[in-house]
């Protein structure tokens, strides 16, 4: 696919712009490591590891006037901190998150309060079993992922 074909692909599918790095690479017909995506906040280009982390965190690409941006690791941490400080709503401990939401822990979406990673079921169950806090921030639930929990010496 040459440059003109890539541009026409994005123009003809305006309602279906890629939302992940993997989808972007596939749409452009290039390897993932050849994607060059700037951070929406600092403007630095994400390195290969950050591109992979972006998709693992289940974050979505940001499109403005058909220009794509993402969020680098440092800006994810800064964004998580800002949102926590500005939009904090409440805290519940462990399994009390199920009482607060009326849903099973298996059905509740939780992101890391530090890095914005999407917590998997093992991480959520670990927080529940240890009675760790879940925080409601900007309408969504936050906990601590397996990597960030080491910041608290909680292993």
Curated annotation (Swiss-Prot):
Function as written in the Swiss-Prot or TrEMBL entry: Plays a major role in the induction and maintenance of cellular transformation. E6 associates with host UBE3A/E6-AP ubiquitin-protein ligase and modulates its activity. Protects host keratinocytes from apoptosis by mediating the degradation of host BAK1. May also inhibit host immune response.
Family designation: Belongs to the papillomaviridae E6 protein family.
GO cellular component terms, A-Z: host cell cytoplasm; host cell nucleus
UniProt main location, coarse: host cell
InterPro entries named in the record: E6, E6_sf
Subunit and interaction comment: Forms homodimers. Interacts with ubiquitin-protein ligase UBE3A/E6-AP; this interaction stimulates UBE3A ubiquitin activity. Interacts with host BAK1.
GO biological process: DNA-templated transcription; regulation of DNA-templated transcription; symbiont-mediated perturbation of host apoptosis; symbiont-mediated perturbation of host ubiquitin-like protein modification; symbiont-mediated suppression of host innate immune response; symbiont-mediated suppression of host type I interferon-mediated signaling pathway
Pfam families: E6
Keyword set, alphabetical order: Activator, DNA-binding, Early protein, Host cytoplasm, Host nucleus, Host-virus interaction, Inhibition of host innate immune response by virus, Metal-binding, Modulation of host cell apoptosis by virus, Transcription, Transcription regulation, Viral immunoevasion, Zinc, Zinc-finger
Zn-finger (unnamed) residues: 39-75, 112-148
The protein's name in its UniProt record: Protein E6
């Amino acid at each position: 696919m040459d440059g003109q074909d890539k541009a026409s692909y994005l123009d003809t599918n305006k309602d279906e712009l890629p939302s992940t790095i993997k989808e972007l690479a596939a749409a452009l017909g290039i390897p993932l490591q050849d994607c060059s995506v700037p951070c929406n906040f600092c403007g630095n280009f994400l390195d290969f590891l950050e591109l992979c982390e972006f998709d693992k965190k289940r974050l979505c690409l940001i499109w403005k006037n058909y220009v794509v941006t993402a969020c680098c690791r440092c800006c994810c941490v800064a964004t998580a901190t800002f949102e926590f400080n500005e939009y904090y709503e409440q805290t519940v401990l462990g399994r009390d998150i199920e009482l607060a939401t009326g849903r099973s822990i298996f059905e509740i979406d939780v992101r890391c309060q530090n890095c914005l990673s999407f917590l998997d079921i093992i991480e959520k169950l670990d927080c529940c079993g240890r009675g760790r806090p879940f925080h409601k921030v900007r309408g969504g639930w936050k906990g601590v992922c397996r990597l960030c929990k080491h910041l608290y010496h909680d292993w």
